[in-house]
Amino acid sequence: MGNSFRVDRVGMEIKREVNEILQKKVRDPRVQNVTITDVQMLGDLSAAKVFYTIHSTLASDNQKAQTGLEKATGTIKRELGKNLTMYKIPDLIFIKDESIEYGNKIDEMLRNLERKD
């Protein structure tokens, strides 16, 4: 029971820190418009799925952001090591968060339905 609380807390802390690191420490223009939306930790804290959105709908920008995040992983982990009191910093797996786009499509469909009425 107590362990799941710790896992959630570590995930929230990593989300906050990674957003800050991307803003202040990573100089790569490919990740300028990236926002971390969620972090899901493995139960043993060995890895973190880091979900992100990008403020662009271009597929090329999405690919550039993914590449930029992967290139910045070393810097991000190093900064996490300075800022977090953890024995081992988890491996970071960056995944594009599709839920916001999906929600926007649903909203648009609902608006279109309202117009037809």
Swiss-Prot record:
GO molecular function: ribosomal small subunit binding
GO biological process: maturation of SSU-rRNA
Cellular compartments annotated: Cytoplasm
InterPro entries from the UniProt entry: KH_dom-like_a/b, RbfA, RbfA_dom_sf, Ribosome-bd_factorA_CS
Tagged with keyword Cytoplasm: yes
Coiled-coil annotated residue ranges, if any: none
Keywords: Cytoplasm, Ribosome biogenesis
Name of a matching Pfam family: RBFA
Gene3D superfamilies in the record: 3.30.300.20
Domain of life: Bacteria
GO cellular component, one term: cytosol
Classification via NCBIfam families: rbfA
Role summary: One of several proteins that assist in the late maturation steps of the functional core of the 30S ribosomal subunit. Associates with free 30S ribosomal subunits (but not with 30S subunits that are part of 70S ribosomes or polysomes). Required for efficient processing of 16S rRNA. May interact with the 5'-terminal helix region of 16S rRNA.
Family label: Belongs to the RbfA family.
Subunit structure: Monomer. Binds 30S ribosomal subunits, but not 50S ribosomal subunits or 70S ribosomes.
Protein name, per record: Ribosome-binding factor A
Organism whose genome encodes this protein: Streptococcus thermophilus (strain ATCC BAA-250 / LMG 18311)
